[in-house]
């Protein structure tokens, strides 16, 4: 889904609204995390088929229903949509230049893979994914082992940090689009990444010292995810800035590398928390995440860009 999303946004959203459109779409992931975490905790405790197996059955059915709706309702572009009027189609083609975006020029893979702004975005996306997935996957363990929260309540406590991003993400998108009318896109993207990652790094350091106070620990986790969601206006949108025609491919590249961090994160956390109930071990986990966010913020601020790249519209680009 990740590579498909920016490709569709490039065809269905005017450039001046892409920050808010992207954040609103991707924030569905946060809503799913909240609902899924709450429901999974309840199903594990009270569900059918022995409890935890019911989680897979319920989520599997939901996935099938959504897939059917996507297949029936989604179209590549306004030019190919069977249910919009001619007036609407003309509006989109005039506003976005949809006719040009329907074309499939050769992909300049060499230029993409050696593009400094793309590499800087990849570093930022990797850090964001690593940190976020560490919270998603390992937060229930932290809640259980350090804070002593039982499995039924664990779902509630683990879901709370992902509520604020549902609001903060779209608001940051609106603010980013407004600021783009005042400042350059490059400045806006770097500003949101730097502010977000710096705040997250600082709060992660503080998290190591909050002790076993459940309310304070959950409040700090909520602050982390809220600040992290501000970066969505950079890491989930910048592909469209750099090369709208190739945004899906760049998203595929950056998200694949970022997902390597998601795969590695649980193993790294497991290696660092072998005793699990030791607060000092979890403190080291938070310090590692803080360092990753700080370093990636510097990399993106120095090397990132919000401008369309010279190779983005090269119809004669080589496929190598």
Predicted regions and their residues:
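Glycine-rich segments within core transmembrane alpha-helices of 12-TM secondary carriers
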Residues: 17-48, 60-63, 161-169, 254-267
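Central mid-sequence intracellular linker of multi-pass
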Residues: 20, 24-25, 44-114, 295-320
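Intracellular juxtamembrane helix-capping segments at the cytosolic ends
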Residues: 1-13, 229-243
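C-terminal transmembrane helical hairpin of 12-TM major facilitator-type secondary transporters
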Residues: 186-234
């Amino acid at each position: 889904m990740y590579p498909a999303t920016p490709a569709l946004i490039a065809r269905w959203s005017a450039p001046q609204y892409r920050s808010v459109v992207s954040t609103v779409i991707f924030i569905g992931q946060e809503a799913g995390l909240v609902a899924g975490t709450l429901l999974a905790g309840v199903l594990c405790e009270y569900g059918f088929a022995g409890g935890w197996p019911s989680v897979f059955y319920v989520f599997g059915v939901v996935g099938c229903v959504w897939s059917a709706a996507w297949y029936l309702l989604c179209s590549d572009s306004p030019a190919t949509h069977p249910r919009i009027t001619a007036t609407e189609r003309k509006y989109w083609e005039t506003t976005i230049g949809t006719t040009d975006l329907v074309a499939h020029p050769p992909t300049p893979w060499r230029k993409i893979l050696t593009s400094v702004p793309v590499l800087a975005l990849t570093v930022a996306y990797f850090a964001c994914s690593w940190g976020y997935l560490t919270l998603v996957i390992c937060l229930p363990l932290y809640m259980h082992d350090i804070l002593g929260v039982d499995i039924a309540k664990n779902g509630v406590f683990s879901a709370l940090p992902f509520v604020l991003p549902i609001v903060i993400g779209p608001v940051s998108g609106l603010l980013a689009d407004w600021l783009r009318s005042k400042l350059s896109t490059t400045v806006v993207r770097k500003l949101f990444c730097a502010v977000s990652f710096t705040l997250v790094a600082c709060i992660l350091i503080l998290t190591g010292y909050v002790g076993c106070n459940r309310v304070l620990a959950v409040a700090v986790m909520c602050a982390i995810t809220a600040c992290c969601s501000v970066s969505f206006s950079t890491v989930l949108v910048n592909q469209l800035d750099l090369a709208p025609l190739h945004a899906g491919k760049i998203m595929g590249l950056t998200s694949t590398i970022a997902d390597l961090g998601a795969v590695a994160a649980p193993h790294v956390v497991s290696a660092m928390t072998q005793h699990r109930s030791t607060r000092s071990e979890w403190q080291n986990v938070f310090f590692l995440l803080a360092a990753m966010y700080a370093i990636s913020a510097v990399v993106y601020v120095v090397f990132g860009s919000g401008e369309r790249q010279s190779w983005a519209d090269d119809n004669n680009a080589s496929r190598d």
